[in-house]
Amino acid sequence: MEKPMASSGPAELFTRVDDYSVANAAAAANEGIVMTTLDAAVNWARKNSIWPMTFGLACCAIEMMSMSASRFDIARFGAEVFRGSPRQSDLMIIAGRVSNKMAPVIRHLYQQMPEPKWAISMGACATSTGVFNNYALIPVNQVIPIDVFVPGCPPRPEQLIYALMMLQEKIKNQSGTVKSVLNL
């Protein structure tokens, strides 16, 4: 495919753009042209720049902290640094048992997070109150919506990394992203 000549006006520019059909996509890729949808581009950016906020309530928090150490290095998945503020994060990782007194705090922090926001429930205690099944504990999915559940007591860092990858896949497959960004 030849490179387009210099245009003499806007009409010629539109003619050249229209010439790039799906059949010519391979040739266009060789010229450095990328074809995608706006939804796919926004979802790609979101899935590769997740800002997690830790909320460690028990022993699972130790495994969550080791996930960001050099051995596992979640930076390669786009989750650079754990944030301490809900206003700077879009992912909340709840690790440990949730008591009735802690539930309003979790809900309040989740509501402070900007849209879009996601949540991961890490460990048996956060998911189903675990071995401490008594009147004072509740599963975290009764407090906030959970996107990914990570089983285990405590789950290994590899399991949490896999949960992060599952969340990235969920973000990638979302539709209507641009409409929600533009409030349409």
UniProtKB/Swiss-Prot annotation:
Cofactor: [4Fe-4S] cluster
Cofactor note: Binds 1 [4Fe-4S] cluster.
Positions that bind [4Fe-4S] cluster: 59-60, 125, 153
MF annotations from Gene Ontology: 4 iron, 4 sulfur cluster binding; iron ion binding; NADH dehydrogenase (ubiquinone) activity; NADH:ubiquinone reductase (non-electrogenic) activity; quinone binding
EC primary class: translocase
Topology with respect to the bilayer: Peripheral membrane protein
Superkingdom in the source lineage: Bacteria
Annotated localization: Cell inner membrane
Gene Ontology CC: one annotated term: respiratory chain complex I
Catalytic reaction(s) noted: a quinone + NADH + 5 H(+)(in) = a quinol + NAD(+) + 4 H(+)(out)
Main localisation: membrane
HAMAP family to which the protein is assigned, alphabetical: NDH1_NuoB (MF_01356)
Subunit structure: NDH-1 is composed of 14 different subunits. Subunits NuoB, C, D, E, F, and G constitute the peripheral sector of the complex.
Similarity-based family: Belongs to the complex I 20 kDa subunit family.
Role description: NDH-1 shuttles electrons from NADH, via FMN and iron-sulfur (Fe-S) centers, to quinones in the respiratory chain. Couples the redox reaction to proton translocation (for every two electrons transferred, four hydrogen ions are translocated across the cytoplasmic membrane), and thus conserves the redox energy in a proton gradient.
Protein name: NADH-quinone oxidoreductase subunit B 2
Source organism of this protein record: Solibacter usitatus (strain Ellin6076)
Lineage: Bacteria, Pseudomonadati, Acidobacteriota, Terriglobia, Bryobacterales
The gene coding this protein: nuoB2
